[in-house]
Design a protein with these regions (language model features):
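Accessory terminal and edge-of-domain segments that mediate assembly/interaction
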Residues: 1-305, 313-490
Length: 490
């Protein structure tokens, strides 16, 4: 069989590189989609020359001039050692802004040879099937298609770079980014499955919550933004249902009432702006498994920040239901990431995020100084994987006491650990909904009054914090999240 040509061509500008990536990806997915439809209809197998087209494009950077130092202290777009860096790329047209943000400073500050061509990594056929209707009624099984077309290879979709599993002294080429095309495509499909949204709707500023009532408040906030004078232009609901600025309020309400969000495990809601800096809220439900699951997938979109805003149990006598907890440390008892990020590894508090949350609380509540301190407690959050941890209180008490924890939940430590691990700025602001150690538990009557008083304000603090960070984007991406062996791309 004749070997496939890789056709690598030097790109002289970032725009030229991304344009060629997009052209090669469109050619590859178009050829694969055409061959797949032809096989479903006529049972004609693709020949060897067609198979050569079913490959992801690859971006390569070769750096030979050791010792060049960038003019800024940014946390990304750096090459640390001479050599060739490479990554396969999927959906380059959709990721164009991100790719240019990485390539422009790299090509400006370093002497590089940038090349684009076809990789040796095949595109699995499921990643060109948009809705699944193409396979319905064809009489062809998935097993048969896997024998004819490239199929998903889970050994290729790994987090080896993010988890530092590669020996950088003996790998060639070096990784250019944390996630290659196969890993990215894997997550793009999962985002759609879990959230009920096309991944293209997800915004770079993300709120994660563990209570549906935050969703109700986010939708109300979104409607206010679309009706009033704001930078937001549309809101996308689960099932890719769109509400546009300019619609009548009655029409908006009718659309909302008919959204079938309960079909999706972790429904997502997207408040979008023309500049691409909108806000996404994901109701992740309860538990560290969900928290890890969704952040594994959202990370491939390279968001600017994710914040956990949800409820927690207050552990201190001085706390009152409705108070806030700003996490500055985490004691991880969730167990889910222990193999890749042992619990003794500290998760640094990111100053840019902490300051934004503190300032947002001040702006939204109108309180400051000692008055704000009465409502906003800073301290360690304990994250469990066992909702009934109280039944082991005698065994858990000594460790909780040593940790000086002020709150307990089931998601925050996992989300922060994922942010640290996957290099996404992270933060946590929780609201005390009960005090399990002081006989103040959630009761139906009290819960309604608590939600009415606290949830709206809490959500607005999270949104205000994201807006503050958006205005200071250049300083947000922290060097605290970079390892010694770090790919050039953010």
């Amino acid at each position: 069989m004749k070997a496939c040509s890789d056709d690598f061509i030097i790109a002289h500008t970032p725009e030229e590189a991304v344009d060629r990536l997009a052209a090669l990806h469109q050619e590859a997915t178009g050829a694969l989609s055409h061959a797949l439809k032809r096989y479903l209809k006529e049972r004609i197998r693709p020949d060897a020359s067609e198979h050569c087209l079913f490959r992801y494009p690859e971006l390569r950077l070769t750096y030979l001039c050791q010792g060049e130092v960038p003019t800024t202290v940014r946390a990304y777009a750096k090459v640390q050692v001479p050599g060739t860096y490479a990554i396969t790329v999927t959906q380059p047209a959709a990721f164009r802004k991100y790719l240019l943000e990485q390539l422009r400073p790299l090509m400006n500050d370093f002497t590089l040879r940038v090349e684009v061509g076809r990789s040796q990594q095949n595109i699995p056929y499921p990643y060109v099937v948009e809705g699944g209707d193409e396979l319905a009624g064809s009489g062809v099984t998935a097993a048969e298609l896997a024998r004819v077309f490239p199929s998903t290879d889970l050994s290729a979709a790994t987090d080896g770079t993010a988890d530092g599993l590669y020996d950088w002294e003996n790998i060639d080429p070096l990784p250019l980014a944390l996630f290659d095309a196969a890993r990215t495509d894997f997550s793009l499909k999962r985002i759609q499955h879990y959230t009920g949204s096309d991944w293209r709707h997800v915004q770079p500023w993300i709120l994660l919550t563990n209570y549906h009532r935050y969703v109700d408040q986010f939708i109300r906030h979104g409607l206010d933004m679309l009706v009033g004078d704001s930078r937001f232009t549309r809101m996308v609901l689960p099932g890719n249902v769109v509400i546009e600025r300019g619609m009548a309020e009655g029409e908006m309400q009718a659309i909302i009432e008919n959204v079938v969000w309960h079909r999706y495990q972790m429904p997502a809601y997207h408040l979008q702006a023309n500049d691409g800096h909108g806000i996404t809220l994901v109701n992740i439900g309860v538990g560290p498994s969900n928290a890890k699951n969704i952040t594994d997938h959202l990370a491939v979109l390279r968001p600017h920040c994710w914040l956990m805003i949800g409820h927690c149990g207050g552990l201190r006598q001085s706390q009152t239901i409705g108070d806030y907890v700003l996490a500055h440390a985490y004691m991880r008892r969730d167990g889910i990431l222990d193999r890749v990020l042992p619990p003794h590894i500290p998760l640094p508090a990111l100053a840019e995020v902490q300051q934004a949350l503190q300032e947002a609380a001040k702006l939204v509540t109108g309180e400051e100084g000692d008055e704000l301190k009465k409502r906003l407690r800073t301290g360690t959050v304990l994250t469990y994987d066992d909702r009934n941890w109280e039944l082991r209180w005698a065994q858990e008490r000594p460790l909780i006491n040593l940790s000086r924890a002020v709150a307990v939940d089931m998601e925050s430590g996992t989300i922060a650990a994922q942010g640290y691990r996957l290099r996404v700025p992270y933060g946590t602001l929780l609201c005390v909904s009960d005090k399990p150690l002081h006989s103040e538990i959630k009761l139906p009557g009290a819960a309604g009054a608590f939600y009415e008083r606290a949830v709206t304000q809490h959500l607005h603090i999270g949104i205000a914090a994201l807006e503050l960070m958006r205005s200071q984007l250049n300083s947000l991406h922290s060097r605290k999240l970079r390892s010694f062996d770090e790919p050039p791309f953010r």
